[in-house]
Amino acid sequence: MNFKATSLNRIVTSSVAAVAVVLSPVFAAVAQAETLVGAGASFPAPLYQRYAREVRKTHKNLQVNYTSCGSSCGIRNFVKGTVDFGGSDAAMKDSEIAKVSRGTILVPTAGGAVSVVYNLPGVSNLKLSRQVLPLIFAGRITKWNDARIRRDNPGVNLPNRRITPVVRADGSGTTFIFTNHLSTISGYFKGRVGTSKKPRWPIRGARKGKGNSGVAALVKRTSGGIGYVNYSYARLNRIKSARVQNRSGQFVAPSLKAANLGLSSVKFPANYRVFVGDASRGYPIVGLTWMMIYKKTLH
């Protein structure tokens, strides 16, 4: 089916209803006061906290707790059976699903944008082209006044300062979405880094933060820093976000409207696993997040 919400707010609202339907057998099996435990991606953590509040309205004795520990952590705990549900911004692989004896249901719960955040005092509305962005995170462009960056930012006083990339320390679905985009638009990046939840970054002097919040905090206090976080974390921390060039050649800043345009052409296959490598409209670095639920409960 097509991903045709008019805004990400509608996506969130509809996904609450969708998850409630999928989780209904789990809730029905709860016969007494109980706690359901989830863990995984930090990307959807605020949304899943909202789910918990909605669930509590109709299931008074049920407490739902979600720990933000990264997508790799979410998949790992779900496969081990140490949680009741998991969260990941990278859909589980067939090999991972095969390890779950209780069966797996993947529910795409929301979509969102990955912002490229930076810390350059005096520089606003930074533009990063499809040629430049992959080379920064592949370690090929190392100075802010590189001619290739200056070309897209005429009249901007870019400093002769080393670029300090900030990446995730943990296995991350946000990293998966980001590297999937860079691998799609750059053959060099694909060969050098590739698409991964936890790649081996070939960047000298890169700093690492745990979770979206950790990356946001590091960029905020690192002059010359650049990183990638979920759009909501960029807004929450009031960090400047670059305008990123999409496939149509437009430089677009992340926003709910721009992310929705980027997601508007998504078509879901039967297994709901779909990845947006390079959106032609709106903001180009977008992706989905999934909730992982067991087909068979233990109750």
How would you label these PLM feature ranges?
Residues 1-10:
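N-terminal secretory signal peptides that target proteins for export/translocation
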Residues 12-20:
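Sec-dependent signal peptide hydrophobic core
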Residues 19-30:
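C-terminal segment of classical bacterial N-terminal signal peptides
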Residues 32-299:
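Flexible loop/hinge segments at secondary-structure junctions
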